[in-house]
């Protein structure tokens, strides 16, 4: 026998069954199509960021988003491109909703396109929640300072530019450099230094924007073959996909990361490549809207737009998870003063610099440690985090790497005229590049192995020259066996 409440619920469900309500208005008032934009007139109460469904004359459906509202006019950016839109016969439906993504832990191990639609022949994702892809700003008072290290397995990153959980640190690269290989290696090897919890507490969200078919195939094959796919969510926007879709892709990735981090308690590493393609998409939309251009044609609000992406990294008070961002960008003509790396450097907390000269000398990974920097490194290393000699070893390695004067003197007067100390520096530099920086694509070194390798190199010098390391630590590690502490 059903209770009154159960009978009422059953009655309501029966009334709702097969009952279609369509309160939305459809418009056929497209005034113009300009690049990726559709301009509509006579629209009743359009809303900024509202999602618009566009039905073409052949029945094909496309999605767009309101970019600008002026009275009864609305400018809509179409994610799938405007090719084939007939001004006279296409219909536009304003949904009254912002763009949302259905998120779930089932997204791990899945591949999506740049609009968040599965492309791996798997079933649709059963959403636990629907989230606005623009995210919600984190209250600065609720932020927790990043103090624990993420281990990448690459010595030049782990020792010299250590990455904290919750940090945002970009990879500055150039066309033709192996940043894709470095990204794939980080995905395969990344983990937590101190594995207090279970291994599944760590996962990766990878978003590719504007990549070609070969690069997309490389990433998918690499992740599937090395077994990291089961802990990875992959968003792929290809070069032949609509440019406008690239504006949405990183936001979908970060919305997924926020759910996995703050609702599921996971430590999420987000890798975004290539942010230069994202900035080019911003410029294309800005040009179509006939906005006043800024430096090199990029919109004046690009700094704000990039900050809306990068600032979604971090840790939140009372939440177990964290979001760490490694955006990858290719500097046009290797110019670090270009607006994209320039503005990125202002927002983020350091950078990892991929060097063309090291790459031309067949060194992999070609990471130049001198222009590289991690501003949050000091709180993520040391006793209880990695090892107590980490900070001193890193400072000493940097100090011994500054050899511009010695190399210039060697080029002018020859090696024979150099002092014995200068010769030690040259020996150190040669072994530093061959043993420390140079590392195989499938070679993973934990931070303790990398620190031990540093001590092997520092023993080239007499103990008294290692003045960046405190005396107690220097005596223990220079003479004795390295230990984990």
Swiss-Prot record:
Gene3D superfamilies: 3.40.50.12240. One of its GO terms (cellular component) is proton-transporting V-type ATPase, V1 domain. PANTHER family: V-TYPE PROTON ATPASE SUBUNIT B (PTHR43389:SF4). GO terms for biological process: ATP metabolic process; vacuolar acidification. Keywords: Hydrogen ion transport, Ion transport, Transport. It comes from Trypanosoma congolense. The keyword Nucleotide-binding does not apply. PROSITE patterns: ATPASE_ALPHA_BETA. V-ATPase is a heteromultimeric enzyme composed of a peripheral catalytic V1 complex (main components: subunits A, B, C, D, E, and F) attached to an integral membrane V0 proton pore complex (main component: the proteolipid protein). This is V-type proton ATPase subunit B. Non-catalytic subunit of the peripheral V1 complex of vacuolar ATPase. V-ATPase is responsible for acidifying a variety of intracellular compartments in eukaryotic cells. SUPFAM superfamilies: P-loop containing nucleoside triphosphate hydrolases. GO terms for molecular function: ATP binding; proton-transporting ATPase activity, rotational mechanism. The keyword Ion transport applies. InterPro entries: ATP-synt_VA_C, ATPase_a/bsu_AS, ATPase_F1/V1/A1_a/bsu_N, ATPase_F1/V1/A1_a/bsu_nucl-bd, ATPase_V1-cplx_bsu, P-loop_NTPase, V-ATPase_su_B/beta. Belongs to the ATPase alpha/beta chains family. It holds the Pfam family ATP-synt_VA_C.
